Swiss-Prot record:
Protein name: ATP synthase subunit alpha, plastid
Broad class of where this protein is predominantly found: plastid
GO cellular component: plastid membrane; proton-transporting ATP synthase complex
Matches recorded under InterPro entries: ATP_synth_asu-like_sf (IPR023366), ATP_synth_asu_C (IPR000793), ATP_synth_asu_C_sf (IPR038376), ATP_synth_F1_a_nt-bd_dom (IPR033732), ATP_synth_F1_asu (IPR005294), ATPase_a/bsu_AS (IPR020003), ATPase_F1/V1/A1_a/bsu_N (IPR004100), ATPase_F1/V1/A1_a/bsu_N_sf (IPR036121)
Pfam families in UniProt: ATP-synt_ab, ATP-synt_ab_C, ATP-synt_ab_N
Species of provenance: Cuscuta exaltata
Its membrane topology: Peripheral membrane protein
Gene behind this protein: atpA
Keyword flag Transport: yes
Amino acid sequence: MVTVRADEIRKIIRERIEQYNREVNTLNTGTVLQVGDGIARINGLDEVMAGELVEFEEGTIGIALNLESKNVGVVLMGDGLMIKEGSSVKATGRIAQIPVGEAYLGRVINAQANPIDGRGKISSSAFRLIESSAPGIISRRSIYEPLQTGLIAIDSMIPIGRGQRELIIGDRQTGKTAVATDTIINQQGQNVICVYVAIGQKASSVAQVVTTLQERGAMEYTIVVAETADSPATLQYLAPYTGAALAEYFMYSERHTLIIYDDLSKQAQAYRQISLLLRRPPGREAYPGDVFYLHSRLLERAAKLSSKLGEGSMTALPIVETQSGDVSAYIPTNVISITDGQIFLSADLFNAGIRPAINVGISVSRVGSAAQIKAMKKVAGKLKLELAQFAELEAFAQFASDLDKTSQNQLARGQRLRELLKQSQSAPLTVAEQIMTIYTGINGYLDSLQLRQVRKFLLELCTYLKTNKPRFQEIISSTKTFTEEAEDLLKEAIRDQTDRFLVKEQA
């Protein structure tokens, strides 16, 4: 007969009691009332938060945007083709966040930070919220460091500083993306991390930008966030915030970043589509009432941080497309009022062969000379005024039959100054090269040359200066000032090269 040992039974029961873990899982769930056009109406989800992520039965993720009395309006981060009416939805208790880190450099990702370049997964342990609040007043400091674009017209007359928001605005096919990509290429060796956000672009256009950056070795320090024209409107709306979160990670790590949004017109259109489908009341041009807030909360995240926070910076170059040069439309006026200046690209200048087609007269940088080195400030001070006077005189000369000698000379000088502002795409110039070019034009050294010879002469002068007067580049790079020694070296080089050039041209 088996003896029952009470102490053993007691021990087993005690162990079982200790192992028992009473867990109560509460889920905030709802059911799908209707789905279509990237929008789902959900019944239930009583405790869902605005902007909270929700998960559908078949795995699609959505964002709760409209919290109404009878149902919740959710925008889908996918096509949602497998979602059925009556299927269950659960709230996740999280808001949208993405992994961030150094591993993203050189990669092409989508708005959910998933790689789309076919080069495998990206491992990262750090996370940032897609939407986070902008730095406050105390967290910032005034902008004082230049961000060189490599384009003479911008660096000399519309200077951009690290931490600035400078709008690039113009009609389609006027070279807006080219200005942005040239700026990225020019950051090589400057210790600046670049983020290029493509919103609603053709996939072929994005591929072309990536190829250009790879060929020039710029992808090493660049992240491309792409949501093409066939992406859901929700992801096109989120892409700029994903880019901003990645740039913020580096900014708060005491690094300098440059972010380009190409372009915010398409983001606004995607947001308008979402809002109209959610039956939000339309306003001007059918955009919802909070479309200004859509862009202001994004662009305010660009900043120059205080010394206490490490002096990191995030410079934003948003791009906005205009229709027939109309800058008084809703989105252009909104973004102009948010940013610290705008670079206006003109279709007329572009078609006249002046590229980059920057209309210097109406372009402005509200940071101004604070974002220029002393050498550039000294040399380029008169350039904008001279070009403005030239434009005025050129308009007058169309109606005048004969001009006096002074006016003719001023016209000739202006034409040469306009010629020296022309640059080939993907050929940014160093600061020393820009100073050399502007100094040569502004002081009349190009007046003796024919207009067609100007670019060839400047190219040869640049090569001659690098080879025979390397001290000039050293002075500009090390002191950031245009010293008497530098000026003497440059004058000497111009004289030598002018003699050689004219002899060669006459031969």
